[in-house]
């Protein structure tokens, strides 16, 4: 980076991009010699595109129209990046919860992205992450294969698309391979898929995924493991709960 006159950061609004952005801002904060060379292009919509999922939707000509809209990265944005990256790596998600509730952050899309990140914690109603529940919903609404589920999430159901197919597949596989699966076995993107009796009860809100299968995974810097209390997302109050 030291050899360039300007460094322009191009980032979308989703949690995948925003997480990379705060990591970079944390890094650049430690390099004051680069501060006056940092610029940013960031967006959550584009004229003529009804459902903007990201820069990958844009043609070369459309991308070219964004050049010139870059703005200098401010000290407040760098400092927010440092604080947000620290919170993202923390084993306690309450700092992220606080940031996700603010509407005055120096990075305009960060709060919504962090909220979407927290929504992929297990929910209090059924122990599912939002991505897991939307997958079951897609199947219940007629998606016949994992590939069609992914398409339904990206194009319709997901409020803030951020998962690529390689990131999404392990989520589908877990739903199928758990001790008490929520969907029928899948091997490829084209495998026929259907809800199991547990999957139907999960969608009805009469079963809990963690009660049936437990959990042991990381979500950012937070380790979710049972036995013991696990951080969950309360979809009614829009807040975190440890239970």
Describe the function of each predicted region.
Residues 142-154, 164:
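Short acidic, hydrophobic short linear motifs in intrinsically disordered regions
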Residues 155-169:
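Short, positively charged loop/turn segments that connect secondary-structure elements
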Residues 40-65:
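Short, conserved secondary-structure transition motifs
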Residues 17-25, 49-54, 162:
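A short acidic (Asp/Glu
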Residues 166-169, 181-243:
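Accessory beta->alpha helical hairpin/"wing" motif in late/C-terminal subdomains of nucleic-acid enzymes
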Residues 134-142, 152, 171:
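Short amphipathic alpha-helical elements of helix-turn-helix/winged-helix folds
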Residues 1-30:
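Long, hydrophobic/aromatic-enriched structural stretches that serve as scaffold segments
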